[in-house]
Swiss-Prot record:
Active site: 1005
PANTHER family in the cross-refs: SERINE/THREONINE-PROTEIN KINASE (PTHR24356), SERINE_THREONINE-PROTEIN KINASE GREATWALL (PTHR24356:SF1)
Family of this protein: Belongs to the protein kinase superfamily. AGC Ser/Thr protein kinase family.
Class in the EC hierarchy, top level: transferase
PROSITE patterns: AGC_KINASE_CTER, PROTEIN_KINASE_DOM, PROTEIN_KINASE_ST
CDD domains from the UniProt entry: STKc_MAST_like
Gene field: IREH1
Residues carrying Phosphoserine: 32, 1070
Biological process according to GO: protein autophosphorylation
The protein, known as: Probable serine/threonine protein kinase IREH1
Function: May be involved in root hair elongation.
Provenance organism: Arabidopsis thaliana
Length: 1296
C-alpha cells in the first residue's frame, strides 16, 4: 500500500491535465501509452519526416541557421524546404488539435517507458553527422560550466539530440553554420529567443511543467544494444517507424524530462572527440532506478496545446509556471529596452545640462542625481531590478511631485515613463500571478518533502547519481551572467538527506569545481493589495510572445529554490508549535513571518494551512465544520458532508460549463449565472439547518448570510490575491486587530450557505479535484450506510478508511476541499468505528443516541444534549482548551477573565456565569438573548464573539479581548474628558446604536462600563443582556423577566412593582451597581423601545464631560427620584460645557420617549449641530485620540472594575483551573456607594443559595448554549494574513 500511495502521490504531483482528467495510478513500467501517446505517434507517422518548426529554434539559433544547414547538408531546393516547413506546420497543428486526442495506435517500439524515449532521427533532418542520445551526461557539467554566457540555453534544457540545439552543437556541418553561430552575440540570441512562433508556445508550455517526471539524468542509461540510439548514424531518412510515443514534430518529451547542461555551441568538435565519446560510454551503463520514478509522461504532450493562450489559467502548476516564465522573459526584454532608453535619456540630460549650465547652475545637482540614477538602473541586473524598480519609481515620483512645473519636472516625468515599462509588468505579475507563484513553490516543497529520496522532477535538477549534485543557472545567468537573488545556493541534495551525508557527497562531486558562488532566481516581490485583474493584453493578444525553453528552465530552478525556503510539513508544524505561546499585537497567537514560513494555523480546524490557500480553506473549512456544530448523529453528519461535497462539485461543473460557453478566458462568470445556481442545487442541506425551534441557534448564520461573504471580500491589504473580486474598503470600517467588518444588516431570509460561499466571485483553487470530491462523497455515503451490529461493518469501515486515504493522497492541492473534507470524513468514520466496537462489547450502547453529556448534572440533560455540540470530545470546546491568565472585571453575577487558547495562543476575554445565579435571578432568557445577538451582529463598534460552551456549573462566553479598558476606567483615571474627544466617542456609540436598532436590538444597559476601548482606540459595545446595574439582582422579586438586559423592539416588559422594602434591599446591594443610566420608562416598567438607549447616551455624554452622571446620588432611591423628576445639575455654559453639548444632552434626557432626540431614528441624532465636524463615513478609519499603549499583550492595567473580587470567584472554574488573583488588586476599585463589598458579596452568595433552594426549578437545561462562531474564527485567519506581512510579532510572558 505504501508503494501504491507513492504512485498516487506522484500522480497528484503531476501538473498534467489530460483531457479525461484521469488521476488513476499507472503500474510500474507500463508499456501502454495513454491517449496523447497514441495521438503523437500517429501524427508523427502520418506527417512524414518531422522537419522542425523554424520558430522552435529561436531559443538558441536563428531560423536562417537551420535553412543554411539544410541547404549545405542535403542541397535541397527551396521548394523542398517550403514543403518541409508546411509539413512541420501541419505537425504543430495536429498537436494543437483536440480531434487528434484519440484513435492513435501506440508505437510498438516503446519498451522502457519515458526514460528511454528515443531521439528524433538525425537523417530525417538532413543532418546525418549529429550524434544523439537519450540520457544526459552529468560529467559534461565539468566542462560546460565554464562556457561563455552566450552559450545556448536550449542545450542546457537537456534536449535528447532531437533538439536542434543539440544537433547544432554537435554538428560538423561546415564553416558557414559555425560562423553564424560564432557570430551570434548575447543580444542576438536573446532577440531570437523572443521571436518564437505561437506553435513553440505549446512546446514550451509542456516543457515548463515542474511535475512532468523524474529527471532523465536520474538514470542516464542508454538503451540496450538493439536500440535506435546506437544505430542512429545508419538509421533511415524517414524515421517514420522510429518516432517514439513522446516525439511528435518539434515537441519532444526529453525537452522537459531531461534538464541537461549545455553543449558547446562555439566548439562543436568537442562532442565528437575521443574523450567525449569515452565519457559518453562510461556514463551509459544502466543504473537502478526507484520504482516510483518509472512513469510515462508522454500524456502531458499536447495536454495544454488544445487550448488557446487566454484559457491558460486553470491554475495547474505547470500552466502557472509557463506564464510566470513568460512574464520573466518579457521583463528581461523590457529591461533591455529600458537600458536603451536610459542611454538616450542620459545623453539628452547631458545636452540639456550643458545648455543651461550658466543660466541655471542650481540644476546641476539634480541632473547629476538623475544621471547617477539612470546609470544605476541601466547597470542593475534584471533580477535586482525586479526587486528594486517599484521603490525606485516611488522615490522618483515623490521627488517629481516636489518640483515646480518646468524642465526638471518634465525630465523626471520622462524617466518615470521609461522605468514604468518594467513596473507595469511587475504589477501585472503581482496582481494576476503573484499568489500562484507561491502556490507552485509551496506545493512543490510539500510534495518533495513527503517522498523520501524521490528526486523532484519539476525542480530543474539533475540527479545522475547520488554523488553528483549540481547547480543550475537561471536564464539570466546563461544569457548575461546575471544574478537573480543574493546569497542563495541551490544544491541538488535529496530533500531528506542528512547534512553530513550531503557534505560528503558534495565534496566528492566533480561538479563542485564549477559551482556558482551564488544561485539567484527571479524573486517574488512583496505582495500588496491587489484587485482581480482583468485579462491583460499579454493574455488576450494572439501574438503574445511565447514562453521559451530557457525560461522554462529558469522556472524549474525557481521550484528548486522553494525546496530550501520551505520546511517539510512536519517541521513546519513543529516550528509553529514553538510559537503558540507568543502573541502579536493583534492578540491572535503569533505566527511565523508569513513570507518565510508560508503557513498559518486555521482557527476553525486548528490545522496548518498554506497562506496562499487561507482564503479558500477558510470557506471550505467553514462548510466542513458546519454540521459538526449541530449534535447530529454520525450517520447524519456523514450524509451531510457527502451532500455538501456533491453540491460543491456540481457548482464547479456548472461554473465550468458557463465559463466555457460565455467567458473568453474561462474564468469570468457573471453574477447572474451564479445566482441561478440556487435553482439547480439541492435544498436539502439548508433544510437540515432549520430543524425544530433552533433556527436562530443552528441556522449557521456565518455561512448562510452575505455578511460572511462580505467579510471575506472586505478584508483590505491582503498579501495574497483573493478571488472574491475587486478589493475595496468602501462601506467598510476598521475595528480592532485590523479586521474589517461591514455595516450591512443581517439579511433575511437566509440563502443556502453553499450557494453563498461557492457562489461568490471567483473560484477555489482546486476545481481540478472534482473527481476526488465525488469519490469522497461516495465514501462518506458508504460509511453512513454501514449497519451497526453487522459483522461485516467493521471491516467495511476499515476499507472505507483505506480508500479515503488513497483519495486524499491523490489531491492536487493542500488544505483545500479534498484534504479538509477528507479529514472530517476520516474523523467521522473513525468515530463510527469506535462506536461499533463498543456495540460489540456492550449491546446496551445505542449508537444513534450516544453523545457526550455536556451539562451532566441532570438526567434530563442527557436527552437534551442530543442537540448540543459535536459528539467527538476533541471537537467540543471546553474551558480546558483555555489557559486562564488573570481576571479583568466583575459584574453583577458574572466575571470576566483574560485567557489564552492553548492550541493557538490567541487571547480572549471569557465571561464566566454561574448557572445557579442565572436561574435564581431569572436571567436565563437574558443570557441566551445576549448569545444570540452576539452571534448575529457584525459591526466594527460591537464586540466580536467566538465561542459559547458550558460545564457542570458555569456558562462561558468567549469574546475578543480589548486591552484598552472601558470608558468607566478611563473616567476614573482622568476625571473627565475634553469635549472634542467625547464627541468622537459618542459619535461611535451613535453608529453602533444605529446598526443595532436597524436589527431590532435595544441594548437597554448602556453605560461607560459597557463601552470598551479597542486596540486602535475605537469604541466597542458589549454586555448584551448581562447588566451590571443593581436592579437586575432583584429580578427574583419581580413577576416578569429582568428589567435590565437586551431585548427585541417588540418585546413587552413587565411593570416594575417595587415596594419600599425592595428599595431598601437595593440600598444594601448598591455594591453591584446603580440605576444611573436607566431611562424613566424602564424604571417604571411602562414599556420602552429604542429611545431608551438614547436616554442612556445623554447620561453618558454628560458624565464624560462633567465627570459624574447627572442623576448621581448616594442611594438608588434618590437616583430614582432624580431621574423621574429630572433633577440635573447643569454646569456653566459655555465655560464648562458648550451650548451644542447642552442642547443635545437636554434633548436626549427628554422624559417623553416620543419627543426624545432619536425617536425618529439615528439620522436626526447625526444631524444635530453637536456632530457638525464628524465625518460619519470615515469615522471608524480615523485615528482615535486615545490609543492604548499596553506594556504587554496581557496587560490589563486599563481596567478598573466598579466591583470588588471575593473568594467566591473561585467557584467559576473546575478544580485545577482556579486562577491566581495575586495581581487582581489593581482591578478592585469600588464605586462610592459601597462600604464593605466583601461582606455584602458573601451575604449575597448566602442569600442566593437560600433562594435557589426554595422554589427555583432545578431542571433548566443549557444544552443549546454551545456555539462556535465560524465566520469570526475565519476572520482571525484574515487578521493574521493581513497583519503578518507588516507587524512584527510580540512575545508575551507566561503568567505565573
Amino acid at each position: 500500500m505504501v508503494f501504491k500511495n507513492k504512485l498516487f502521490f506522484s500522480s497528484k504531483k503531476s501538473g498534467s491535465s489530460s483531457p479525461d482528467s484521469s488521476n488513476s495510478p499507472r503500474s510500474v513500467g507500463s508499456n501502454s501509452p495513454i491517449r496523447s501517446d497514441k495521438k503523437k505517434s500517429k501524427s508523427a507517422s502520418k506527417d512524414e519526416p518531422p522537419i522542425p518548426i523554424p520558430g522552435f529554434v529561436g531559443v538558441g539559433c536563428k531560423q536562417t541557421q537551420i535553412k543554411d544547414g539544410l541547404k549545405k547538408k542535403d542541397g535541397s531546393s527551396k521548394g523542398k524546404q517550403l514543403s518541409s516547413e508546411v509539413q512541420a506546420h501541419s505537425i504543430g497543428k495536429s498537436n494543437l488539435s483536440p480531434s487528434s486526442e484519440v484513435k492513435k495506435p501506440p508505437p510498438p517500439e516503446v519498451k522502457e517507458g519515458p526514460a528511454f524515449v528515443s531521439p528524433i532521427m538525425a537523417s530525417s533532418l538532413g543532418l546525418n553527422r549529429i550524434k544523439t542520445r537519450s540520457g544526459p551526461l552529468p560529467q559534461e557539467r565539468v566542462f560546460n560550466y565554464r562556457n561563455d554566457p552566450a552559450t545556448s540555453n536550449l542545450s542546457k534544457m537537456g534536449a535528447d539530440g532531437g533538439d536542434l540545439g543539440s544537433g547544432s552543437a554537435t554538428s560538423g556541418s561546415g564553416s558557414g553554420n559555425r560562423k553564424k553561430e560564432a557570430g551570434s552575440s548575447k543580444l542576438g540570441l536573446e532577440e531570437n529567443m523572443d521571436r518564437t512562433r505561437p506553435s513553440d508556445n505549446k512546446s514550451d508550455r509542456d516543457s515548463l511543467s515542474p511535475d512532468t517526471g523524474p529527471p532523465r539524468s536520474l538514470s542516464p542509461t542508454l538503451p540496450p544494444s538493439g536500440s535506435r540510439l546506437q544505430n542512429v548514424a545508419s538509421s533511415s531518412g524517414t524515421g517514420r517507424s522510429e518516432m517514439s510515443s513522446g516525439r511528435s514534430g518539434p515537441l519532444r518529451n526529453s525537452d522537459f524530462c531531461t534538464p541537461e547542461n549545455s553543449y558547446e555551441w562555439e566548439n562543436p568538435k568537442e562532442s565528437e572527440s575521443p574523450r567525449y565519446q569515452a565519457l559518453l560510454r562510461m556514463t551509459s551503463a544502466p543504473r537502478k532506478r526507484f520504482p516510483g520514478d518509472i512513469k510515462s509522461f508522454s500524456h502531458e504532450l499536447n495536454s495544454k496545446g488544445v487550448r488557446p493562450f487566454p484559457l491558460w489559467k486553470p491554475r495547474r502548476s505547470n500552466n502557472v509556471e509557463e506564464v510566470l516564465n513568460l512574464i520573466r522573459a518579457k521583463f528581461e526584454k523590457a529591461k533591455e529596452e529600458v537600458n536603451s532608453d536610459l542611454a538616450v535619456f542620459a545623453a539628452d540630460l547631458v545636452g540639456v545640462l550643458e545648455k543651461n549650465a550658466e543660466s541655471h547652475p542650481e540644476w546641476e545637482e539634480t541632473f547629476e542625481d538623475l544621471l547617477i540614477l539612470a546609470r544605476s538602473c541601466a547597470m542593475t541586473t534584471p533580477g535586482d531590478f525586479w526587486l528594486q524598480c517599484e521603490g525606485i519609481v516611488q522615490d522618483l515620483d515623490d521627488r517629481r511631485q516636489e518640483l515646480p512645473p518646468g524642465v526638471l519636472k518634465q525630465l523626471h516625468t520622462r524617466m518615470l515613463f521609461i522605468l514604468t515599462r518594467c513596473t507595469r509588468l511587475l504589477q501585472f505579475h503581482k496582481e494576476s500571478w503573484g499568489e500562484e507563484e507561491q502556490v507552485v513553490q509551496l506545493r512543490q516543497s510539500r510534495v518533495l518533502h513527503s517522498i523520501e529520496k524521490i528526486p523532484p522532477s519539476g525542480a530543474g535538477r539533475s540527479y545522475s547519481a547520488a554523488k553528483v549534485p549540481s547547480t543550475k543557472k537561471a536564464y539570466s545567468q546563461e544569457q548575461h551572467g546575471l544574478d537573480w537573488k543574493e546569497d542563495a545556493v541551490v544544491r541538488s541534495v535529496p530533500p531528506l538527506a542528512p547534512p553530513e551525508n550531503y557534505a560528503i557527497k558534495e565534496s566528492e562531486s566533480p561538479a563542485n569545481i564549477d559551482r556558482m558562488s551564488s544561485w539567484k532566481k527571479l524573486p517574488s516581490p512583496a505582495l500588496k493589495t491587489v484587485k482581480e485583474a482583468p485579462a491583460s493584453e499579454e493574455q488576450n493578444d494572439s501574438k503574445v510572445e511565447p514562453p521559451n525553453i530557457v525560461g522554462s528552465r529558469q522556472g524549474r530552478d525557481d521550484a528548486a529554490v522553494a525546496i530550501l525556503n520551505f520546511p517539510p510539513a512536519k517541521d513546519s508544524h513543529e516550528h509553529s508549535s514553538k510559537h503558540r505561546h507568543n502573541i502579536s499585537w493583534g492578540y491572535w497567537g503569533e505566527q511565523p513571518l508569513i513570507s518565510e514560513e508560508s503557513s498559518i494555523m486555521c482557527r476553525i480546524c486548528e490545522e496548518e494551512v498554506p497562506t496562499t490557500h487561507v482564503e479558500d480553506h477558510s470557506r471550505v473549512c467553514t462548510l466542513a465544520d458546519k454540521y459538526d456544530q449541530k449534535g447530529l448523529s454520525v450517520d447524519e453528519r456523514l450524509m451531510a458532508v457527502a451532500g455538501t461535497l456533491d453540491k460543491i462539485a456540481e457548482t464547479f461543473r456548472h461554473k465550468d460549463s458557463l465559463a466555457a460557453a460565455e467567458s473568453p478566458d474561462g474564468m469570468k462568470v457573471s453574477n447572474s449565472h451564479l445566482t441561478e445556481e440556487s435553482d439547480v442545487l439541492s435544498p436539502r442541506l439548508s433544510d437540515w439547518s432549520r430543524k425544530g425551534s433552533e433556527d436562530m441557534l443552528d441556522c449557521f448564520p456565518e455561512a448562510d448570510n452575505s455578511i460572511f461573504m462580505d467579510d471575506l471580500r472586505g478584508l483590505p491589504l491582503m498579501s495574497c490575491r483573493t478571488r472574491f473580486g475587486p478589493k475595496s474598503d468602501q462601506g467598510m470600517t476598521t475595528s480592532s486587530a485590523s479586521s474589517m467588518t461591514p455595516r450591512s444588516p443581517i439579511p433575511t431570509p437566509r440563502p443556502d450557505p453553499i450557494e453563498q460561499i461557492l457562489g461568490g466571485k471567483g473560484t477555489f483553487h482546486d476545481q481540478d479535484d472534482i473527481p476526488q470530491m465525488s469519490e469522497l462523497a461516495d465514501i462518506a455515503k458508504c460509511a453512513a450506510d454501514a449497519i451497526p451490529g453487522d459483522d461485516q461493518s467493521i471491516p467495511f469501515l476499515l476499507s472505507c478508511l483505506e480508500d479515503l486515504r488513497v483519495v486524499i493522497d491523490r489531491r492536487k492541492f493542500d488544505a483545500l476541499t479534498v484534504e479538509t473534507f477528507g479529514t472530517r470524513i476520516e474523523k467521522l468514520i473513525r468515530e463510527k468505528y469506535v462506536h461499533m466496537c463498543e456495540l460489540m462489547d456492550d449491546e446496551k450502547v445505542d449508537l444513534l443516541s450516544t453523545v457526550i453529556d455536556e451539562d451532566a448534572p441532570l438526567e434530563d440533560d442527557v436527552v437534551r444534549s442530543l442537540r448540543t455540540s459535536p459528539v467527538h470530545p476533541r471537537d467540543r470546546t471546553s474551558i480546558d482548551d483555555f489557559e486562564i491568565i488573570k481576571p479583568i472585571s466583575r459584574g453583577a453575577f458574572g466575571r470576566v477573565f483574560l485567557a489564552k487558547k492553548r492550541t493557538t495562543g490567541d487571547l480572549f476575554a471569557i465571561k464566566v456565569l454561574k448557572k445557579a445565579d442565572m436561574i435564581r435571578k431569572n436571567a436565563v432568557e437574558s443570557i441566551l438573548a445576549e448569545r444570540d445577538i452576539l452571534i448575529n451582529v457584525r459591526n466594527p463598534f460591537v464586540v466580536r464573539f467566538f465561542y459559547s460552551f458550558t460545564c457542570r456549573d458555569n456558562l462561558y462566553l468567549v469574546m475578543e479581548y480589548l486591552n484598552g479598558g472601558d470608558l468607566y476606567s478611563l473616567l476614573r483615571n482622568l476625571g473627565c474628558l475634553e469635549e472634542d474627544i467625547v464627541r468622537v466617542y459618542i459619535a461611535e456609540v451613535v453608529l453602533a446604536l444605529e446598526y443595532l436598532h436597524s436589527e431590532g436590538v435595544v441594548h437597554r444597559d448602556l453605560k461607560p462600563d459597557n463601552l470598551l476601548i479597542a486596540h486602535d482606540g475605537h469604541i466597542k459595545l458589549t454586555d448584551f443582556g448581562l447588566s451590571k446595574v443593581g436592579l437586575i439582582n432583584s429580578t427574583d422579586d419581580l413577576a416578569g423577566p429582568a428589567v435590565s438586559g437586551t431585548s427585541l423592539l417588540d418585546e413587552e416588559e413587565s411593570r416594575l412593582a417595587a415596594s419600599e422594602e425592595q428599595l431598601e434591599r437595593r440600598k444594601k446591594r448598591s455594591a453591584v451597581g446603580t440605576p444611573d443610566y436607566l431611562a424613566p420608562e424602564i424604571l417604571l416598567g411602562t414599556g420602552h423601545g429604542a429611545t431608551a438607549d438614547w436616554w442612556s447616551v445623554g447620561i453618558i455624554l454628560f458624565e464624560l464631560i462633567v465627570g459624574i452622571p447627572p442623576f448621581n446620588a448616594e442611594h438608588p432611591q434618590q437616583i430614582f427620584d432624580n431621574i423621574l423628576n429630572r433633577k440635573i445639575p447643569w454646569p456653566h455654559v459655555p465655560e464648562e460645557m458648550s451650548a451644542e453639548a447642552h442642547d443635545i444632552i437636554d434633548r436626549f434626557l427628554t422624559e417623553d420617549p416620543h419627543q426624545r432626540l432619536g425617536a425618529r431614528g439615528a439620522a436626526e441624532v447625526k444631524q444635530h449641530i453637536f456632530f457638525k465636524d464628524i465625518n460619519w463615513d470615515t469615522l471608524a478609519r480615523q485615528k482615535a485620540a486615545f490609543v492604548p499603549a499596553s506594556e504587554s499583550a496581557i496587560d490589563t492595567s486599563y481596567f478598573r472594575s466598579r466591583y470588588s473580587w471575593n473568594t467566591s470567584d473561585e467557584q467559576f472554574f473546575p478544580s485545577g483551573e482556579v486562577p491566581d488573583y495575586s495581581d487582581a488588586d489593581s482591578m478592585t476599585n469600588s464605586s462610592g456607594c459601597s462600604s464593605n463589598h466583601h461582606e455584602e458579596g458573601e451575604a449575597e452568595e448566602c442569600e442566593g443559595h437560600a433562594e435557589f433552594e426554595s422554589g427555583i426549578p432545578v431542571d433548566y437545561s443549557f444544552s443549546n448554549f454551545s456555539f462556535k462562531n465560524l465566520s469570526q474564527l475565519a476572520s482571525i485567519n484574515y487578521d493574521l494574513l493581513s497583519k503578518g506581512w507588516k507587524d512584527e510579532p510580540q512575545q508575551i510572558p507566561h503568567h505565573k
